[in-house]
Amino acid sequence: MKKLYIRTFGCQMNEYDSDKMADVLGASEELVKTDNPEEADVILFNTCSVREKAQERVFHDLGRVKHLKQSNPNLIIGVGGCVASQEGDAIVARAPYVDVVFGPQTLHRLPQLIAERRHSGRSQVDISFPEIEKFDNMPPARVEGASAFVSIMEGCSKYCTFCVVPYTRGEEVSRPLDDVLAEVAGLAGQGVREVTLLGQNVNAWRGEITRDGGEQGDFAFLLECVAEIPGIERLRFTTSHPREMTQRVFDAYAKIPKLVSHLHLPVQSGSDRILAAMKRGYSVLEFKSVVRKLRAARPDLSLSSDFIVGFPGETEEDFEKTMKLIDEVGFDASFSFVYSPRPGTPASDLADPVPQETKLRWLARLQKRIDQQAQAISQAMVGRVERALVEGLSRKDATELAARTGNNRVVNFVGNPRLIGQFVDLTITAALPHSLRGEIVTTET
């Protein structure tokens, strides 16, 4: 039996795409996944170019599998994702042992690219943007577990000055409603009970309701439709953009109980001057207005965010405004990074860089503050009963189970493994730095 090894870098969109690569090659090549690259017949790296370190790590990992190609000339090594889109032929020039290079929109062509590589003996590169063609060429999803991702749109048309996504994934393209609903229904039929809708700007979905054109639906309508699918008990989405938060989305939080009380809403900075330089399209006041409306609809809403510190020209005053916003909003988790210029983006040409030591100092302060807020929120949950989906065995102790609450907290507890994939009610007994402890109250069958 031939085997496939996939190494995934970056965001949840990449995790979803990696699953699709496995589906495509499983259907066409009868490949089964392995966690050991040493025994693989095909090795794929699904890459991320959002951060500089992630990009360099790809080439480091490619170097680590080079010897496998030398011992097994039939081994196929491929590079996909955003680094592939950005670098293209340059990947083969830097690592000639790479057989195929493909972008996020051409992963469905993997079988053809591999076949052509074997036939011609030449490395194959396809980093075009054929919009949603890839979704028309996917076999039915194969899943394990009670949670799954579903991509509802691809690309980004916001062109923030620091970001490479529009250049590596293309502009925004929404999937038709019937396609999305068919995929979710298929997952529900396999036992999935929680679905996360994915997109670079997921709430910008404005796709056609049907393939014959005409009527358009907005993101709130899509949420309503997905929530009605039998078997789906919990609904998440990521990543959202503050500019796309409409009153209808606020209303969805008030009237769709299946929509979880957690939202990832990237703000990037608390300074209007820096937000304008980033071309984010909103002010701090407008962002706080979005938060107020969300919490008016769902008072217990938990918010996580993205922050970039050390953007060109950022001052101590700008950074303190970010810290003030963190205190005012009460974020309880974040993906925060020091700014690193990405080739080809407008921000990479900006002068007045912030010293690295200043960036690191700011980052440490920001992360510490959010960790403190997260711990306070977790501590307030102690004694409460939380409904949680049991995801699997605990990473900390394989004799225990791990479940996830609606506000995205992991709870470790003692329970029967047969509960995996079910919802349980848990009394929260302790708040640890990165997880909760709980005791089971009731179970669902």
Swiss-Prot record:
Main location per the UniProt record: cytoplasm
Cofactor comment: Binds 2 [4Fe-4S] clusters. One cluster is coordinated with 3 cysteines and an exchangeable S-adenosyl-L-methionine.
InterPro entries reported in the protein's UniProt record: Elp3/MiaA/NifB-like_rSAM, Methylthiotransferase, Methylthiotransferase_CS, Methylthiotransferase_N, Methylthiotransferase_N_sf, MiaB_methiolase, rSAM, rSAM_horseshoe
Keywords: 4Fe-4S, Cytoplasm, Iron, Iron-sulfur, Metal-binding, S-adenosyl-L-methionine, Transferase, tRNA processing
Domain MTTase N-terminal as annotated: residue spans: 2-119
Residues the record lists as binding [4Fe-4S] cluster 2: 156, 160, 163
Keyword set includes Cell cycle: no
Domain of life assignment: Bacteria
The EC number(s) this enzyme carries: 2.8.4.3
Residue span(s) of domain TRAM: 379-442
Protein location: Cytoplasm
Cofactor(s) this protein requires: [4Fe-4S] cluster
Annotated ranges, domain Radical SAM core: 142-378
UniProt entry tagged with the keyword tRNA processing: yes
SUPFAM superfamilies recorded: Radical SAM enzymes
A Gene Ontology molecular function term of the record: N6-isopentenyladenosine methylthiotransferase activity
One Gene Ontology cellular component: cytosol
Family annotation (Gene3D superfamilies): Methylthiotransferase, N-terminal domain, tm_1862 like domain
Catalytic activity field: N(6)-dimethylallyladenosine(37) in tRNA + (sulfur carrier)-SH + AH2 + 2 S-adenosyl-L-methionine = 2-methylsulfanyl-N(6)-dimethylallyladenosine(37) in tRNA + (sulfur carrier)-H + 5'-deoxyadenosine + L-methionine + A + S-adenosyl-L-homocysteine + 2 H(+)
Self-association and partners: Monomer.
Function text: Catalyzes the methylthiolation of N6-(dimethylallyl)adenosine (i(6)A), leading to the formation of 2-methylthio-N6-(dimethylallyl)adenosine (ms(2)i(6)A) at position 37 in tRNAs that read codons beginning with uridine.
Name of the protein in question: tRNA-2-methylthio-N(6)-dimethylallyladenosine synthase
Name of the encoding gene: miaB
